[in-house]
Swiss-Prot record:
Protein name per Swiss-Prot or TrEMBL: Large ribosomal subunit protein bL27
GO biological process: translation
Presence of keyword DNA-binding: no
InterPro entries per the UniProt record, alphabetical: Ribosomal_bL27, Ribosomal_bL27_CS
GO MF assignments: structural constituent of ribosome
Amino acid sequence: MAHKKGQGSTQNNRDSAGRRLGVKKFGGEFVRAGNIIIRQRGTKVHPGSNVGMGTDHTIFALIDGIVKFERKDKERKKVSIYPAS
């Protein structure tokens, strides 16, 4: 019985692909209606004026304009779109 014991493969050597979250359009950038501004998990940033929020909390532009990041209150942030004049 001069056999080697079978070499077991490791079970924990896996990782999932990144979800590509984060800010897609930054403050001062021009966006068109429908452009995604932020992809996020939960409401890290809340929608302001002229901005919509998808079912997965994605924030997107409702009008063409300039992106502006603002404070909603002491701890919450919001993003708004103002028409380019």
